[in-house]
């Protein structure tokens, strides 16, 4: 398996492995356990082969149902041993949230994460629970572009296993673009400060427990994601 974080899966444009990052007690995050990216609907045959050879056996979609089907294709894996799971982590029927963020140019920045986390603990916990209970093999988690919803779940996962905020921010910024950076700068902030405020607002393990995860689910995440036999 490659130990390059940036992965070239033909048909996807924003794919990377969350392995190799320093976590609690000097442990490293395990390669091939969690891969984040954009929607796999456009993967070529070669792209699917690369995904499979990387060890992915579960695809976790974080996308929201009820949108136009042509813009929201259902991903069907060409491999029978790859399980596809859907956990919607946003509720587009929440008019107050949609009016505040979806009509704003800040929708594509982490500024909205605090509101999303406060509103939908059960949805975020369900996504992490799906990872904890996934069949053996790696998990590929995605939304449409691999930025926001995928970013939130990656943020929670990496915090849970003790990756530093600096490294989490660096991972987030691999998907950033100059426009979003400028939007933050115009508000006298940056990605690190926004993620710092987001993390300060929650006690993560209690947040997940109150959202419906069990302690065994949380432990399973840590066991899966941490390479402890160093």
List PLM regions with ranges.
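Cys-dependent protein tyrosine phosphatase-like superfamily
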Residues: 1-140, 152-230
